[in-house]
Amino acid sequence: MATKVTVFANGKARQVSAEKTVAEMVRDLKLTPAAVLVERNGRALLRQEWEMERVEHGDRLEFVKVVAGG
């Protein structure tokens, strides 16, 4: 059984696998990767980092949907 950690996604505590990547979190939350920015513990992540960055206990993740319009 995979070890679980607690992370905070947009302020809400979530139990997730300790092996989960930021990219997997984006998919789990059904967000469109091209239309979202991710901040981890106060640092903005580049999209190419998402597959390499594994969540850790206590991480604070902010998923910000980008909206454009006039």
PLM regions and their residue ranges:
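Ubiquitin-like/PB1-type beta-grasp interaction modules and other compact soluble beta-rich domains
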Residues: 1-69
